Amino acid sequence: VTNNEELYYIYAEENELSALDVTHCPKLIWLSANGNKLESIDLTACSDLYNLNLSENLLSSIDLSVCNDLGPCRLSNNNLEEIIMPSEGVAPTTTLDVKNNKLTISTLPEKTLGMSSASRLTYAPQAPYVLPKDITAGTVVDLSSELKAFGVSDKEETTTYTWRLKTSGTALQKDVDYTEKDGVFTFTGTELADSVYCVMATAAYPKFTGTANMFKTTNVHITVPAGVDENTVSSRIITTGNGLIKVLNAENNDMIEVFSLNGALVTTRKVSENMETIKVVPGSYIVKIGNKRCSVIVP
């Protein structure tokens, strides 16, 4: 649509459009082009735009920075990973629908100053936060970008993270199956019956709730470092302060091996007494006795 400087309205819904040029439409106030195949669109000439509907396209990002008069704005069912919001922070004032995209807690738009209530922002569900399909125990999983957000709240909110088994939904145990600090996770290498995923919940975006609308990661398979068996001997191992690991009911000539979570061998010990005590630097380890193992956190 070129050389139409007096054009006010465009209705182009449900076509096969892969491109739409509105850079020469400075007076455009109404653009309805939902249900097309647009991968990008330049709206930087459309500062008078009031009504925008680009839902059900293939957009991965959109720049609304000059669209400070927006009322209703519909961008659902795209591939959006980034939205540059109107620069004055007031618009859209009527509705903003961004559900069914690839936005995260950290990239979702906040409730604007012009919205009369949080219900005018529709954001759930979103596509899962993508993680690698396989992660080795000891590898850091960094979700700290999602830890803090304002969203529709009047204050900054903190995200709650819950790791669950894929099929059963059973929650994993913090400081047993994984350690966490400020949204950064390390899996300890405990035996897990299934792949896992992380559910992220926050009062910043309270509609991320329930099976259909929860915000979660993709499924991840946690692998144990090579040379460490899947069996467990946790009932025979205790830890105390000062970096001590104690192995109970050990049999003579059993080989005890202590690994870091990334699979590096820390120390070995051949059992000579019923109880063996091993000194290590406080931290998380995998202890292997014969062909059995368990993870421990040593204070």
Task: Tell where the protein language model's regions lie, with residue ranges.
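Solvent-exposed loop segments of extracellular immunoglobulin-like
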Residues: 150-167
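Surface-exposed, flexible coil segments in extracellular/virion-facing regions
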Residues: 167-186
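Consensus "Asn ladder" position of solenoid repeat domains
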Residues: 15, 36, 54-57, 75-78, ...
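Leucine-rich solenoid repeat scaffolds
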Residues: 68-137
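Canonical leucine-rich repeat
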Residues: 20-22, 41-43, 62-64, 83-85, ...
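Leucine-rich repeat
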Residues: 3-7, 23-28, 44-50, 66-71, ...
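Conserved LRR concave beta-strand detector
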Residues: 8-11, 19, 29-32, 40, ...
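C-terminal outer-membrane/trafficking sorting elements
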Residues: 11-13, 32, 229-299
